[in-house]
Structures are given as C-alpha cells and as structure tokens.
C-alpha cells in the first residue's frame, strides 16, 4: 500500500469513526430508532452479525430484540420487519413511502443502477416499466394464450422421463429437465423461441451465464465491501468479474434474441397483432421513445432471473416435499384420478377443480418460500414505522418466511401439511390477502409474476404426480432438503436424484 493510499484510508477510518459515534449518540434523542445490537465505530453491527443475513439468522435476531429491529452496517441502515402488522404498514398502508428499492454494489452492476423494473426506485420510470411489461407478460389473456404451450412443455418432460431408462431404477436429477422446461416456457412468451434439448449449444451458454450471474449476485461473500466502504477496494476483483458476466449476458441477449426478433419483424410485410410475443411489445415502446436500448435488455435480464429461477426453485421444493411425504403424494394423485379421471392430463382450466393440488402449491410456497425476505424495500425520505423513526434510504427487509413459519401465528408450521389450507387457513391465498402469507409480496411492488407462476406450478407438479410414483433413490428413505440461502433467495442445497416410476393407466 503506497503512502497516499495509506493516508486516505486512515482519514476515511477517522471520518467514519466520528460519523458512527455521532450517529450512535443520536439514538434516543431527536430520533427514536428501532432496537437492535449497539453499533461500534466504523463497522456498525457488521462485526456482530457478519455477512450472512439470511432469513433464519434474522429471525434469531428478531427473537432477541423485537419485531422491528435496526442493524447498522456503517453507512447502511437495515430495518428488519417480523410481524404481519408491520409488514402491512410497509407494503400497503405506507406503500408509497416504502415503495422504493435499495441496491448493493453488485446489483448496481447487474441492473445498470436500476434501469430494470425490479430494482428501480419508485417513481415515473417504475410506473412506465410496469405498464410496458404488464400487457405482454402479466394478464389473464397471456395465460390463456400460452397455457397450451405450458401444457405441451410439461408433457414433453413426462415423455422424456419415461424414455429415460435410469429414471425408474436408479433415478435422475429431474431438475435439469425442468430447467429446460422453464426456459422454454418463458422464452416462448418473450421471443417465440424454444430450445430442443439440454445439449442445445445456445441453451448451454445461456444457462451457464445465468447461473454465474445468480451465484455472484446471491452470495453473501461480498457484503463486507458493500456495508463498509473502506473495505470496498478488496472487492475490486469480484466486481470486475460481475461486470464481465453482465456484459457477456447482455450481449448474448442482444445478439441472439433481441436483434433476431428485430430482423424478423422488419422482414414481415404485414404484422399480425395476434402473433406478437412479449419482446415485440417492448420494442414498440422503445420505438416510441418510452424506453431505451438498455431498458430493453434489462427487462430480459429480469425475466431470466425473476421468472425462470424462482419458479424452478419452487417446483423443485414441491417435488422434494412430495417425495419425502408419500401419503401426501398419494392423496394428491387420488384427487386428480377422481376429479379428472385416470389418464386425463391436468390442464390450466382443471386447476380450480383440484383444491388439494392448490393446497400443495400453497404449502410449498409457505414452508419453502423462494424469496424469504422479499425484494428489499427502501424509504427515500425519513419515515415513521411502528412508533420508530426510520432514517431516509434505509433498507427494509420483510421476513416473509418467518411470518409464514412463526408458531405463534401458524399451527405446527414446521410440518409440510397442505391440509391447513383446506381447514384452519382455508381463507388464505397467495395473493397477499393475509399478511402472514406473502410468497409474492403484496402492494405496489408485489411480484406480478404470480399470474404465471401458480398455473405453471400446478400443471408441472400435477402432471409429474399423475404420471409417476416419485421416490427417493435406492437405499434412501428420504432426500436431502437442506436449504441454501442467498441475498434474498432460498433454494434446495443439493439437486437430488429422484426415482420416477411410470404409472399404468
């Protein structure tokens, strides 16, 4: 370290210490701040709580302190919400005040500092992006237009598993085939494109880049440099890799999908409105000057992550729980056989006639919530919450997993028991009508993908259970359902091998 850098570092440490001491002295005077561990100069609470701020660790902190707690990470304030009443305040009652988004140093790179829809600040740009994305993605018309494609993709999964001789004996990692299915479902909607197999070179390249993006973004290992600016130089290599991955992904989206669709559109003498795919609507908005080239690519970026990955995680969790709870799997199969008739493959219109299947989906989303802390919220200005002062630009984490797994709010929440949604919790829906259960959030910044995710989950899990007896591999009574958490993700740690024995109809 040269002398100039050393001087700058020491000066930064001194100023940070003075700032931290000054702020800590403000606690309880002009500001009534939420409770939490006492911060130390420069590092705040980072030395006490570390980098791994997953839903379970934050639950433990809430039990120690309060349903609203404040963590100071040097320059960042993290407010953790752990009660339905406070969640309602953040997401609904004060939805405008807390409707913005905070980003960290890595998400700044992957979203172009909020040029997407998920991580943009609340305001005119967000409203414009939401409007542009709603028509091609998030309406019942889209569901009805594409449901036959979803059913076809699910049927292809069933056929491929039946053809795989290993599936019924030693088992297969079915997630790999389901991943192809999810890409085909969403790329049909986005680009009217699909991949023929898991070996398709473009699919392999796309999957690898998306996987690397997720690994880099969801890791906790860069938190120290995000929380503590004086440590940020140590992230230089990490952030360089993030930028390289971001550039390669956006170039791939542009070269192989967006530009290809532009060429296709320009060669058509007459354009059939009924055949428009999502990117056509988005490119129309670009031509009108509503969004720019970068916005188009960041919308594609969001769909690759927010739609494909989260739904895939939930499908994988649902299958794992059914493998480990054979009595529930059998009960679900019996319902479909009774209501639809043996051999009649479940379709999107059938889902409303299958309450136990719906309950299985709800219970999967409750116990194994894909986004357990929701996407972080932020207040642009000083605000009040639960009788406390919340400083401007605080990162608000709603621990939705704990709201749905708190034994004070749910009967035996640690159990996978779909019956709860047919009995004591029969009124609870996934759309946020009960603030104990928020798998998609609620309010202005809720996940609009709920309208796609629920039928895709129902069709996929329904067809697998209809056509196969899903079992652990030989020598195991259950499969491993250990969790792997991320910045705000929750997926299964090990992609387990599943035995799929075809049923005879």
Curated annotation (Swiss-Prot):
CDD domains documented for this protein: CYP73
Enumerate the subcellular locations listed in this protein's record, separating them with semicolons. Answer: Membrane
Q: PROSITE patterns from the entry?
A: CYTOCHROME_P450 (PS00086)
Q: Which SUPFAM superfamilies match?
A: Cytochrome P450
Q: In which pathway does it act?
A: Phenylpropanoid metabolism; trans-4-coumarate biosynthesis; trans-4-coumarate from trans-cinnamate: step 1/1
Going by the UniProt record, its keywords in alphabetical order are: Heme, Iron, Membrane, Metal-binding, Monooxygenase, Oxidoreductase, Transmembrane, Transmembrane helix
What GO CC terms are in its UniProt record? membrane
Q: Where are the transmembrane segments?
A: 3-23
Which residues take part in binding (E)-cinnamate? 213-218, 306
Instruction: Name the Gene Ontology biological process terms.
Output: lignin metabolic process
Q: Tell me its cofactors.
A: heme
- Quote the catalytic activity from the record: (E)-cinnamate + reduced [NADPH--hemoprotein reductase] + O2 = (E)-4-coumarate + oxidized [NADPH--hemoprotein reductase] + H2O + H(+)
Q: What is its EC number?
A: 1.14.14.91
Q: Which GO terms describe its molecular function?
A: heme binding; iron ion binding; trans-cinnamate 4-monooxygenase activity
User: What topology does it adopt in the membrane?
Assistant: Single-pass membrane protein
Pfam families, per database record:
p450 (PF00067)
List the induction conditions: By wounding.
Question: Where along this sequence does the record place binding of heme?
Answer: 447
Q: Which family does it belong to?
A: Belongs to the cytochrome P450 family.
What does the UniProt record say this protein does?
Catalyzes the first oxidative step of the phenylpropanoid pathway in higher plants by transforming trans-cinnamate into p-coumarate. The compounds formed by this pathway are essential components for lignification, pollination, and defense against ultraviolet light, predators and pathogens.
**Protein name according to UniProt:** Trans-cinnamate 4-monooxygenase
Species assigned in the record: Pisum sativum (Garden pea)
